[in-house]
Amino acid sequence: MSKLDEKKQLKCSFCGKTQDQVRRLIAGPGVYICDECIELCSEIINDEFEDDIQVDLTSLPKPTEIKTYLDQYVIGQEDAKKSLSVAVYNHYKRINSNTNNDDVELQKSNILLLGPTGSGKTLLAQTLAKFLNVPFAIADATTLTEAGYVGEDVENILLKLIQNADYDIEKAEKGIVYIDEIDKIARKSENPSITRDVSGEGVQQALLKILEGTVAAVPPQGGRKHPHQEFIQINTTNILFICGGAFDGVDKIIERRTRTSSLGFGAEIQSKKEKDLGKLLKDIMPGDLLKFGLIPEFIGRLPIVVTLDKLDREALIKILTEPKNALVKQYKKLFELDDVELEFNQEALKGIADEAINRNTGARGLRAIIEDMMREIMFDIPSQENIGKVIVNEDCIKTKKPELIEAEGGKRLPIKPKKGKKRKDSETA
């Protein structure tokens, strides 16, 4: 080979191989890289990425540690938090145990969450997944229909989990799926109907195999299955399913059962008001869910039943002020970005909580109430340079006009973060 040809011969800048020794050589600004080096780099990056995202279930947190973490984000619901902590701990302990090839194989126990709207069902499931660092997906049962009808197939629930796991199937197979509004797929009548119930009993039947544990075929693009498309295979045996719903009306079923079983001179007399405080749901039996419209096989796939209490005024006030991401703290931060101090007095917090109770929205409705109160002032504050402090009182819920305090000197100054002092929520929030 001539010296001129040697100069023209291109080489990989990393391994030194010439373009004749590799399949492809890609040029950059003054450098070249061959296909072999690209493949090697890709393997190194993928290995490091897998190490970063691997679900570590060997150092499983204990139930007390799980509950302590839940306490930071979820106010009240002590019984529910304890039950969930134990259930989740046992679920992932079971996964570790079944890899040891013991004679006894532990079966999966999915969870059914019952509680009023805005009591914290979704938040509990989200917080659990965040703490355990596992993939998490939320699905809405009202969008699901039986295969072959307009709507979503049940396999689309698993697609959301796979997507949230960055298409890492092994990681997704140890995730958590929360199916909301599960009470909406109850069959329309307690008795089996001769007409097809495609969004009720049909969906329950379709969910059975996934809940129990099966290798499901998931269409990668979602939507309906087509015979000629490729599917993602995922084993649902180790996926924890948490199904939640308000189950409006099940309290009447429980009340009828307990009333008929507590007749006579020795019967315990309890007022309806006392039963409404959350004690009624704790008496729920599988037969009550059957009468509500869940089929026996579906009830059997959800052996752990956790009930949540209806939030009272005290609990709602704590939700407004105590969690790490409490609403009051969020709005204070928003105003602080405009160099304005925001203060909610105790009467205002009570009024907001009472309004949420009147609307029957629970904690979910708190943001809407505050947003409605603060809309006008949040519109005006950026333009009013003389306002240094905003105080929200009880009247503000109706008038939408909080008390405004002018800044010293007629112009507000940047707010400096306070150090060493903690404001008491009991005095002002």
Swiss-Prot record:
One of its GO terms (biological process) is cell division. Coiled coil: none annotated. One of its GO terms (cellular component) is HslUV protease complex. Zn(2+) binds at C12, C15, C34, C37. GO terms for molecular function: ATP binding; ATP hydrolysis activity; ATP-dependent protein folding chaperone; protein dimerization activity; unfolded protein binding; zinc ion binding. ATP binds at P116, T117, G118, S119, G120, K121, T122, L123. Belongs to the ClpX chaperone family. ATP-dependent specificity component of the Clp protease. It directs the protease to specific substrates. Can perform chaperone functions in the absence of ClpP. Component of the ClpX-ClpP complex. Forms a hexameric ring that, in the presence of ATP, binds to fourteen ClpP subunits assembled into a disk-like structure with a central cavity, resembling the structure of eukaryotic proteasomes. This is ATP-dependent Clp protease ATP-binding subunit ClpX.
